[in-house]
Amino acid sequence: MADDSFDAIVVGAGPAGCACAYALARYGRNVLLLERGNEPGAKNVSGGRLYAYALDMVDPELRSRAPFQRRIVREQIMLLNEGGAVTVDHHDPLGGGEGADSHSVIRASLDAWFAQEAEAAGATVASGVKVDALLEEGGRIVGIRAGEDEMRADIVVAADGVNSVLARQAGLFPDVKPHAVGLGVKETLELPDEVIDARFGLRDGEGAARVAVGCTAGMAGGAFLYTNRGSLSLGLVVNPEQAGRSGRPVQELLQDLKAHPAVAPLVEGAVPVEFSAHLVPEMGHDGVPARLHREGLLVAGDAARFGINTGLIIRGMDLAMVSGLAAAQAILASPTRAGVGETYMRRLEELSLLPSLRALRNYHGLFGIERIFGAYPALAGDVMRFLFRVDGSVPAPMLGGIRRLATSRVPFGQMARDAWKGFRCL
């Protein structure tokens, strides 16, 4: 490849990179898609859930071929305490309705499939390639260097993950800061489909997505559980700074979660087949760097720190695909290299990615209310236990009993301040 030249080189065969390469190849551009792992998906980690609208935006015909696991029809929220949980279960047989459906996915399968689709559309896909540096001439990015090979292109798209080496080398933004990311760990647990259906109240092809708080030893973060075909994806995301100070390995927290009385029956008998860890963007709009392009370079996906976490909804893959599509559309629409960056930013606006981040930018402030991750889930358990307790004694007045329980966990003044802060975040 030493003397190869391309219209575009895309670094990273995740959702952003594959979407970009696929869209460019469909329109006849000579595009090279590079993946550091031995194959696409080998180094990518996700819980994982894909909101299908993003795939439809890239190409509606992809949906029928995509390796979806299960269509999510149950949304579940768990507030865990030491001995039990308060669980909210929303069952929607329509799975969100037309255009709003989502599916559990296995990233290794999804990324491998998407890269194959890009290759079938005409892209060149090369795996096991570590990009060491960008090539720069006269202040412009003109290609990449991988080992002894130099590959040139009109445009390079950096889709190389949250700790993007290329974006840092280009001077677009510094090293990722611990407070700006979450440390995610995940186990894939094999379990027969009929057992999954019975435990989660599902029928064939239906899936459940569950989020939980109260399981991170008071640290900012939470848990997720997705049902797949023949397996479960169970994991935790915590603040890495707090995890480091706590001295507790995150893997230990994950094992504690599996043993929790509200979780253990769901995973009983499941066989662990994979463990993985990954950094994920956590700051939402405020974590997106001010500059996402230089002449000859665009930054997309996790590398651009695109992510949304409201506590109820966690979005990453859909934003990555949309940003990859935006990058491809900008390249296709721009007659000169100099104008691609501004066109890219316009497409991120027009495809609703940046407006969505702005609309939800305050949600991250909720994670600054430390009692959400310990005291309040415990309080929810106290209140429910009080409401349902019948022991033959004279019942306490409901309002007074709840007030007594609440103030035993959190002083009233602190609760009022937390409520006001939470209200402002929403």
Predicted regions and their residues:
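Predominantly flavin-linked oxidoreductase catalytic cores and closely associated redox partners
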Residues: E117-V263
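N-terminal Rossmann-like FAD-binding beta1-loop-alpha1 element of flavoenzymes
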Residues: D4-L33
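FAD/FMN-dependent oxidoreductases across multiple families
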Residues: T216-M219, R229, Q242-S323, T336-T343, ...
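Active-site-proximal substrate-binding core of FAD-dependent oxidoreductases
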Residues: A326-F373
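C-terminal auxiliary extensions adjacent to catalytic cores
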Residues: F367-L426
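Conserved Rossmann-like nucleotide-cofactor binding loop
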Residues: A16, E39, N163
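N-terminal FAD cofactor-binding segment of flavoenzymes
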Residues: G37-G83
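Short beta-strand to alpha-helix junction loop
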Residues: G95-Q116, A243-R248
